[in-house]
């Protein structure tokens, strides 16, 4: 019906157009137009158009017409002189413009009366061939949906130092992520180990748990290089002539032998050259020039002439033919289709020949080396102290000449770790891989040998679609590069250009030292004085490098240097690594480097003799016995931060594709809110723990609830990225990011608890090395936190660079002024540097020595490293970590080049009349007063990035010249960054420290607005260089109060404000030109762990050996943020409840659920519907409340604070009425939920109100109701905020004078509560202020003392009193029955009180007086008129 409506409307529109054309023609006739000439011209135009678009030629002996998409709109007429006109119709839907992708097929002849069948082209007089292009301008050519199945490569069997390609699909990536989690959350890892021990009840179970834990921490150990760091020391026996060495990739050996010079032998590179090409695979093909030849039944086989061309792929078949497609008989007709195959992208496989593997080795002598020549290879070669050589299987032996040191011979056995017969180097796109030979040969892709250009198995990347009567389409498959990369998971990535650098393999050499000799043994001792050019430095290998400066000129001479245990005993200890050090030149002040190995403990390095002797105290940590275990121990202590890149969940399987989407949509939001700040491993462990509890639960409903919750947690932990952002609170001037808090307090001091850390120092060191090779000499930090990050990792980077033989050191200088920008960027790389266990362990304690080349971070601009050669803004935030003392922020290299600041730490907000732009450096505050204007800005530091538009408020149509904080130093492009009378402060004092921008007068100065004032200029300080104050200032058209900058060096005015008259030479000018809500607490594992630990303590007796480590572990976890102080409070409450219920059969599981899920009180109202629930009912009700809580967070439905306060008030009243363990514990836990701290006062007020109303409802006597009702009514009036609490309180006191001796204990608490309510209404204080309880305590103490009546009372027996039965009651006076209370006062038993009308009138007078001070006098007069009788009134405090 819908289709018919569209067709009807289309027909109507068509009729309207035809009518309009007809009417226009009739008008032309009336005007005398020549219709015949018009028709002739139209026909001529059609013929010319057809001739211009359609082309005629021949194909296989028949006519071929070439058409485009404009020709198929109408009948195509082909003139034929012999047979007359041939009309053809083309109805193909894939006609495009002409290109290489063409198709040719036959248009059959259909006789009159036959409808076309299974053809999209036909003619009425003669069959012809049609040809057209299939390209379109809007999309790519049609591709096949099919893909080639490529078998997975599998894990490489090579022992390799580099990570495999897409290794994340295997278990090793899981272990690496586990290690990453352990590094970032060590407290959780420690507790997980304790849990694993405690969960096992026997040795067998404990072994299983230990196996699991070992799997979790296995990546911390690596057996490839265990016991071998990047530098090993080998000692030859006395008199030995040779020593065997084993060199690995990037390793270095130091050889020491008696009476021989010390040598360093280093493996520099393993490289394979002249790779032979084996086979090329095509993974992306294109199909062009398709042609189809068809025959009718009984007319023979169809034959396409293009079969003879080897570049074409052809396929024969049969189709149904008959009258509807140009055949006289019905049956199967032959069809032959050919298409041209061409390869667009190919993967090439190459083989490595064993004889083409080269090993580059360097040998260095520990001789007389100056600090300038240290690490300078060319200088050392010139001094015959170093040599490089290449070892190949064809030349395994080499002899090196070392000048005066003799010569050394190496006989090597090259043993590559690579079995060249089993591996190929396969290049796919820009990446190369080491692949197994069998896998390579079994690839189901078109291939060609290197000696041929013809492709085999081409049909694997082509698809012949279903054949029609005379037409068959052919399409190519899409690029298979993605499938190849996925299948290559586990293969080792290599770098290939013309050669391949191998990362596996070793070289076994025999070093012959018989011809080595010490140099300088005949020299005399140096007699002049030495001095330490630099303090001795630890190398990180247990040795010390000393740079000495010699003042004498009697060289060459030997250096008297020794290491002694005491200056009183000159017995040498330790040994010299640089054997027989000497000064080589006779020039004065020459410098020499000496390396020595001091003993463990304290020692002295003594240089020189006699009175010219100098010494340096040295301490070497460790012990002689411990040295034997240092390699393995330091390996075990290694902590490696591995990146989470390339994590791939393809191995989970397709079963989650449908279920997972639903789970993600339902629970994803709640999961991010509750668990966003946690590591995914922690989330997974929690899910596994819930699954384990579900399996062990006896009750079916509880088991199902645990299993469902645990399963959802495990799924979301592995599928939802744990991201957290920043939240901003304007009133408290605080900004939260991750799990930390950033506070900007009232004294304008920044307290930041953030610590930036690189994703992994190994990759950062490689990035620095790569940047330095590309001409980047240093880095400019964007913020002070990035600068602190470089300072923190500097030593570790330098160790990595040194251990990988890179002559480069990272130097971090103190930043000067603002943080400036630079044009270059650091680029990402997948490679990482390697570091041995020993080197890592020593890097923690000792800084490495400085290399010859430096990579400079911050500091002043120098000629060696100008800003144009530095990188900047290359790092962005990846993730937030844990911690109470600081939030760890993990960084990664930016993939794109941008000048924008990192948006992950930026918060913007508008609340009321205040707008704030804020990040970890800036707090920019604007206020609305008739118009929005900038009010103040506080700068932790000044940076040079640009504020992103995505985090900018009201940024439409802003002119940069109006921005007070310039856009180039991260000023927001916002209309909030403006103020009338001021333009952009591009020459403000932005290089100063501790800048606060606001609008006020600098102390001791005045500013006047005058036309005679000077023009804008750089900001000027209000004090001169000598400290003299400049008092008179002016501006032309600024607004007052003036713009000022307060800095550490004084007060500065804005650029519009100039000094009236002053000596220009003494002014201090700015040298800058700037133009060049609430968060829900995360679910924490800590509380759950404490419950389990307590259970184990109760189940088993813990000895001191277990208790002390457990307490220390708990303290560690508390410091690291795994347990919060609120968790401790919840834990104490729950343990108390568990002990209280231990002997009564009660259950505290529902209370534990309230504590762990932090359920808001409003969702627990259902538990209040009955005074007694069974244990199972309690658990189910709380689970329901937990689900309600999760749903409200996910749907972002906030629960109003009054509802939560009312719920807690009702819980407290219920606990007072029915004091069971559950009813008492529940309100305490509810008060500890997030956000309840701001509702304590509301809760107290509601409790008072509930008790008051209940007591009024139960009051049987009108008098008491009037007394208590008056106070409650006054309290209700004051809570609205419209009535004065002081006036109402005074009025009630006057009405009811206190005549009691003192307060009873029950009424004292009522007094405290009422004072809370009144003072809370009077003073709008912060919820964290302690002034309320302090003020109340003082007020109550004074009031109690002043208002009380004290009487000395004693008992004295005067006489015996007895009742006489004769005493009769006579008279007609009214009888008054009284009772005596605890305070000794008499009360009428039945006192009606004042009439209701008088009571209402009095309350109205008191309320009127409280409403406005002007009504106090008339209200007092009206009140006095009601005082007709005198009655004893109750005390003011007589209220619940």
From Swiss-Prot:
Residues 320-333 are annotated as: Fusion peptide. Keywords: ATP-binding, Capsid protein, Clathrin-mediated endocytosis of virus by host, Cleavage on pair of basic residues, Disulfide bond, Fusion of virus membrane with host endosomal membrane, Fusion of virus membrane with host membrane, Glycoprotein, Helicase, Host cytoplasm, Host endoplasmic reticulum, Host membrane, Host nucleus, Host-virus interaction, Hydrolase, Inhibition of host innate immune response by virus, Inhibition of host interferon signaling pathway by virus, Inhibition of host STAT1 by virus, Inhibition of host STAT2 by virus, Interferon antiviral system evasion, Membrane, Multifunctional enzyme, Nucleotide-binding, Protease, Secreted, Serine protease, Suppressor of RNA silencing, Transmembrane, Transmembrane helix, Viral attachment to host cell, Viral envelope protein, Viral immunoevasion, Viral penetration into host cytoplasm, Virion, Virus endocytosis by host, Virus entry into host cell, Zinc. Glycans are attached at residues 68, 376, 852, 929. GO terms for cellular component: extracellular region; host cell endoplasmic reticulum membrane; host cell nucleus; host cell perinuclear region of cytoplasm; membrane; viral capsid; viral envelope; virion membrane. Residues 1405-1425 dip into the membrane without crossing it. The chain crosses the membrane at residues 36-56, 181-201, 208-222, 675-695, 702-722, 1148-1168, 1179-1199, 1201-1221, 1238-1258, 1270-1290, 1303-1323, 1327-1347. GO terms for biological process: clathrin-dependent endocytosis of virus by host cell; fusion of virus membrane with host endosome membrane; proteolysis; symbiont-mediated suppression of host innate immune response; symbiont-mediated suppression of host JAK-STAT cascade via inhibition of STAT1 activity; symbiont-mediated suppression of host JAK-STAT cascade via inhibition of STAT2 activity; symbiont-mediated suppression of host type I interferon-mediated signaling pathway; virion attachment to host cell. Disulfide bonds join 225-252, 282-338, 282-343, 296-327, 314-338, 314-343, 412-509, 526-557, 726-737, 777-865, 901-945, 1002-1051, 1013-1034, 1035-1038. Residues 1200, 1259-1269, 1324-1326 are lumenal. For RNA-directed RNA polymerase NS5 activity; Mn(2+) is more effective than Mg(2+). Its cofactor is Mn(2+); Mg(2+). Residues 202-207, 696-701, 1169-1178, 1222-1237, 1291-1302, 1348-1404, 1426-1440 are cytoplasmic. This is Genome polyprotein.
